[in-house]
């Protein structure tokens, strides 16, 4: 635990790119000290959000989406957001699944948010849940409690890997965001401030909110009499959002580099590619 006062650690950025081969295999304890821009907050009285790209630290920290979400959640004074990454072989070795910033167990968070970019990471989602001791299926979590009587974390997902087709992972998540999340996250935080005591009420409200797919409340079968289409979210004005690096680390594909999004999507329109569905200048 940190001191009662909020501690925000922003190290002086060393912007020189590290020479030589990047380290793909650093574990959580090795990677954290090398970071610049880490945000560490006291846990007292805050909404605790775990943020995960279900892949290695090296891959996850190469993602601007993860960095944008990290900054957006932590921008709220009554919210803390800490990162959790998948580590090859960690589950099989019986290692506990802990957050990077405060070494907190995944099950201790109020919300566990996943940003998923690739279909192959679906398998890592299930492995992470099992490693954390959390029932993988949403129905199992709804029907049970943790050993101390607390509810399980609310599990949500977003990203292109689920926007294209959420159904492969629908049984594992309480709610899935379809589309772009910049404008959806602040509203989600507002709902969590008032609704975490009763997850059923919170999920019902999300089900009525554009962009959110709550699998157990919305049949996926188009022939079902209660089928309702999910409205996909698009950011109305990308320049309103600073999609650039928040964290710097030598242990990523773009070692200690500042990244900026200058456009989103692709205008070529190849039918086999999901990137064709959006082209927006930043």
Predicted features by range, described:
Residues 1-44, 93-98:
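Short N-terminal or domain-adjacent regulatory/targeting segments
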Residues 61-69:
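Conserved alpha-helical elements of sugar-nucleotide-dependent glycosyltransferases
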Residues 86-224:
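Glycine-rich beta-alpha loop elements in corrinoid/cobalamin-binding modules
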Residues 34-45, 102-104, 146-147, 203-204, ...:
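Short boundary motifs at domain starts and secondary-structure transition points
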Residues 240-282:
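Radical SAM [4Fe-4S] cluster-binding motif and immediate context
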Residues 50-59, 80-89, 110-122, 136, ...:
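Core AdoMet radical
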Residues 42-49, 107-110, 151, 253-257:
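A short, charged/proline- and glycine-enriched loop
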Residues 68-80:
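Short helix-loop-beta junction
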